């Protein structure tokens, strides 16, 4: 896949949280406890670790616990250490909820997702929010979006 400037290629991994541990990023005490290593086990038994940082966005500002089913999204083209289990920097974390579907992707000028599985039809009453919960009134075309 070719990387376009400023566009992340999102890839997700879903599984149940088996462990959450503090991750030391440096000797700086001001960030102590701010970084977590979240271990997920997929339904097929595969294991993935996500580094959750201060800038990781949790959809709906959900708090996650051991046993929760979640999906972690990372930049598929970002460099990663060659270790087992694989370890990715979590960009977005979604706590999977019954009856709720979440799509994280780049949407083009026709509001079609990069994998062509979803086309957005925005209605007058559609809530469009920034990650901080404030309304967004601009054009949605050619952007990375989280669709719930």
Enumerate the predicted regions with their spans.
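Short, basic/aromatic beta-hairpin or loop at an interaction surface
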Residues: 39-52, 116-126
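A cross-kingdom feature marking solvent-exposed beta-strand/loop segments within repeated
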Residues: 46-62, 126-134
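Short, flexible, surface-exposed loop segments at domain boundaries
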Residues: 1-37, 59-120, 132-148
């Amino acid at each position: 896949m070719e990387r376009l400037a400023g566009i992340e290629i999102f890839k997700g991994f879903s599984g149940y949280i088996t462990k959450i541990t503090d991750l030391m990023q440096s000797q700086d005490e001001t960030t102590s406890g701010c970084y977590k290593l979240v271990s997920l086990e997929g339904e097929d038994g595969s294991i993935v670790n996500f580094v959750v940082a201060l800038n990781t966005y949790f959809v709906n500002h959900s708090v996650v616990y051991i046993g929760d089913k979640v999906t972690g999204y990372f930049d598929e083209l970002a460099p990663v250490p060659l270790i087992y289990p694989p370890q990715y920097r979590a960009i977005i974390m979604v706590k999977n909820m019954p009856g709720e579907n979440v799509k994280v992707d780049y949407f083009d000028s026709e509001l079609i997702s990069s994998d062509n599985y979803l086309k957005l039809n925005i209605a007058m009453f559609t809530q469009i929010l920034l990650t901080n919960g404030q309304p967004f009134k601009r054009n949605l075309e050619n952007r990375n979006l989280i669709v719930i």
